[in-house]
Amino acid sequence: MTSPSARIALVTGASRGIGRALALSLARQGAHVVALARTQGALDELDDEIRALGGQATLVPCDLADFDALDRLGAALFERFGRLDVLVGNGGILGPLTPLAHADPKDWNKVMAINVTANWRLIRSLDPLLRASSAGRALFITSGAAHRARMKPYWGPYAVSKAALEAIARTYAAETENTSSIKVMLANPGPLRTRMRALAMPGEDPATLRTPEEFAEKAVPLCAPEWLESGRLYDFPSDRVLDFAAPM
């Protein structure tokens, strides 16, 4: 049984990479982790790891593109827990690295569905539960591809999706600032030793990269009740919390 004092934390894309590291770090902090990912087997492995830490998890095998399932998730979590303390919007896909003029509409729509629309549907479904928490926290994982001073060619669908995600998170931060205790943050992990990074940069030596676990150690405090800032971006490569600046 989940302790009444345990933080209830939902992590999307929780079965591997950054999501897995965040889920395990939250479990170490005593949170009951609601782990959402597509693959049941990988979720079962995560559950075993969380139990080995003495923690508890609820497994949600779900495709982020299944918007009806995301809509139902809020009701299911409310029935079981009555609130949600932490939402970590981590799940995402890279999509093809291709010139914008050559991007296939199906690929474009899939990237936008998972990286953008799914996070809006989660906010829509889970906002009442975050408001029911005494210290609701939302953390969305972005990318440096979204806000480079000079955009990188061929990353169009992914970069556009992450820029849209940043706008969603900042809008949600503005809308909750004076109406709730919710705090909303973005985090840019930078280059990490993940499967997505290997797909994007196949010639790169992964041993030169930092790990998802190192990032999680820095990112999880953004989900704590003690964290009181909102609408800002934590940049892991520079280890700084940044404001968004208006164009010059």
Feature annotation, model-predicted:
Residues 6-7, 55-56, 83-84, 130-143, ...:
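Active-site loop of short-chain dehydrogenase/reductase
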Residues 15-17:
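Conserved glycine-rich cofactor-binding loop
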Residues 29-45:
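Conserved glycine-rich Rossmann-like NAD(P)H-binding loop of the short-chain dehydrogenase/reductase
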Residues 41, 61-72, 105:
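The beta1-alpha1 cofactor-binding region of Rossmann-like NAD(H)/NADP(H)-dependent oxidoreductases
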Residues 93, 131, 137-178:
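Catalytic loop of short-chain dehydrogenase/reductase
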Residues 98-100, 107-110:
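Substrate-binding pocket helix/loop in short-chain dehydrogenase/reductase
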Residues 178, 182, 186-187, 194, ...:
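C-terminal helical subdomain
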